[in-house]
């Protein structure tokens, strides 16, 4: 990337805003200043910071920055009759909107489902709104971990960089949702979830669950890497 701290999806927006800034200053200082502020806001929205990711294939980590709006036992979206725990993370317009792989493994499914653009903070948005559903078979335990990138009122563009057959590392970048959104992670039944409603999560860093049920003292404080 030319600008490592900005996601490439933001380049067109920033470029247009910058051109308008130059034109604006040609007419008046005030107009140029307005467009300059818009340029800075675009750069802030599409920021793409590195994260310090735990090196542990047994973990499920948060795929996004945001607030946990619900932790609920629901039916698996890919296996009828099988119950899983859904962790829903709401991203406000101020959060980093780059999404990260919550688990290490192999991508088994990527599907786009059209829908509405209702507020992403509601549970109904999961089934009604436009979304991209991905399934990663975990390196540890061969669990099918489902991730849903859900559109919202302002989030009209979901970008998922995953492709079936890809091997992904824990915390690696997997896409972005533009302008406010929601991400759901489905944790296998029997795996304790380590976050609750109201928790603020950091994408690529906050641990949601440990797939190794024999580890009772939490995940080991072993090694981390910048991703």
UniProtKB/Swiss-Prot annotation:
Primary localization class, coarse: membrane
GO terms, biological process: phosphatidylethanolamine biosynthetic process
Catalytic activity: a 1,2-diacyl-sn-glycero-3-phospho-L-serine + H(+) = a 1,2-diacyl-sn-glycero-3-phosphoethanolamine + CO2
EC numbers for this chain: 4.1.1.65
Cofactors, names only: pyruvate
Membrane topology: Peripheral membrane protein
Record note on cofactor: Binds 1 pyruvoyl group covalently per subunit.
Modified residues (Pyruvic acid (Ser)): 181
Enzyme category, top tier: lyase
Pfam families, sorted: PS_Dcarbxylase
Record: active site: 181 (schiff-base intermediate with substrate)
Any one cellular-component term (Gene Ontology): plasma membrane
Record localization: Cell membrane
Lipid metabolism keyword on record: yes
Subunit structure: Heterodimer of a large membrane-associated beta subunit and a small pyruvoyl-containing alpha subunit.
Protein name: Phosphatidylserine decarboxylase proenzyme
Provenance organism: Anaplasma phagocytophilum (strain HZ)
């Amino acid at each position: 990337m030319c600008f490592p701290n900005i996601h490439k999806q933001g380049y067109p927006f920033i470029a247009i805003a910058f051109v308008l800034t130059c034109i604006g200053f040609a007419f008046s200082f005030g107009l140029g200043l307005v467009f300059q502020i818009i340029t800075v806001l675009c750069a802030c929205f599409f920021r793409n910071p590195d994260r310090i990711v735990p090196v542990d294939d047994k973990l499920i980590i948060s795929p996004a920055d945001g607030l946990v709006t619900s932790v609920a036992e629901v039916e698996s979206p890919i296996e009828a009759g099988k119950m899983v725990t859904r962790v829903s993370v709401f991203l406000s317009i101020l959060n980093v909107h780059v999404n990260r792989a919550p688990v290490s493994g192999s991508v088994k499914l990527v599907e786009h489902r059209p829908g509405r653009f209702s507020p992403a903070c509601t549970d109904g948005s999961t089934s009604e709104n436009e979304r991209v559903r991905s399934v990663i078979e975990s390196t540890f335990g061969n669990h099918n971990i489902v991730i849903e990138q859900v559109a919202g009122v302002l989030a009209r563009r979901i970008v998922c960089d995953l492709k079936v057959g890809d091997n992904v590392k824990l915390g690696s970048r997997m896409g972005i949702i533009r302008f406010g959104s929601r991400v759901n992670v489905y944790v296998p039944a029997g795996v304790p979830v380590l976050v609750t409603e109201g928790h603020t999560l950091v994408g690529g860093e906050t641990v949601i669950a440990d797939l190794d049920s024999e580890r009772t003292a939490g995940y080991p404080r072993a090694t981390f890497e910048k991703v």
